[in-house]
């Protein structure tokens, strides 16, 4: 059952500016068409800023979203997603499932690494083996890769896994050269992307320069610089003064001011990130009771959070699977119902109310969410004590077995597939099962779901997984974040990514 991916779709999407991803840049340009149809000059450099520094430039090491706008422009994966989360070819041009556990890949020819060497099957095998050895990418059933010739490989799985292709879109699955040197690679990365590293000053800025031998054609802008600016209000100010062209993570209360400025623009995209609350299912206290966990969800008015704190830049979550993800299903959960919350508490033996503790970090939005939750839960008899501590402290305490009640957290479904959520957060064996959810029936249903192809059986298993999530309520999805980027009105061609891996190869900023 051969599945060749049509390249014409990519070409159309790039031309219309609605996505497309990776490639199609053509020759370097000095001018573009302006709003009046006349050619205008473009700047040699695009400067963007974000709040957090990078820990490494090595894309294959598990990283947070903060690294993606740099790493995704230095590296390429085998497959990628466009802005609508439709899978597109990248360094692999075709795939074929020879059987349920055998995947054959055809690789793109004529691809150069930044050091001038050719990308081939040896590099792909090395990369897949590398990320499997690290064991942090939910590769799961990977059972090795064999080289058929320079541009064909065969990947074996230990068991069927319909979600395996989505794993190959991860930034962490970007192809690196077989001569990879882990000790040096974090500071001197070598990829196949449209930009290569020019200069890096840790904690200050990172500058990339155009890679003229990029397989998709040279990027339109010569230089791309990311500045680290921790203070959110300063990022807005730098955009307003023209010191930067693009600002990430602008404060929600700055958005209306930016929208009113004719020299600036707000760009938005749906997101794979869900802001959520984890509930300790193994607690000896009240939250160990599923009726109490359901009562907590029924007490939360999620729409109020979106409207009052996010100024509408978010979508209420009916579960913890992003709406753009594969195998998302609209599903009735424990919706806002204060009277039902009181009834559930009484049913659990807590008609006089309870005291719970919520862990959160000091992020401004999280702090505000915690305060809203405190007010809403109080209305049904839940007295919420807020404890502010950094995320690493919370995670370390959980791993050490510390008892807790509730924790504000988030999960970004980077593969664009619901499997990433089930596998990553809800299995009893999941590294990130911070809710300490243990349900053997859920585990068994997941194992069958993960290895069952499309059809009625898989759909029935998926329904069971959703049923268990609602019945047991180990995690409450609050809202899906909208990606919001502020930019000069002279910016064109930036492709936003639902996981934050924004692509700049077709982006330009016009001059005055």
Language-model features: where?
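Periplasmic-binding protein-like
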Residues: 283-324, 368-369, 469-477
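Surface-exposed binding/hinge segments that line
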Residues: 96-100, 137-178
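Extracytoplasmic/peripheral linker and loop segments enriched in polar/acidic and small residues
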Residues: 385-394, 420-489, 512
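Gly/Pro-rich hinge or "lid" segments in bacterial periplasmic/extracellular proteins
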Residues: 83-86, 169-219, 223, 339
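Structural transition elements
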Residues: 311, 315-347, 365-366
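Ligand-site clamp/hinge motif
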Residues: 212-257
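Long beta-strand-rich cores associated with HINT superfamily self-processing modules
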Residues: 485-512
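N-terminal lobe/hinge region of extracytoplasmic solute-binding protein
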Residues: 49-98, 190, 501
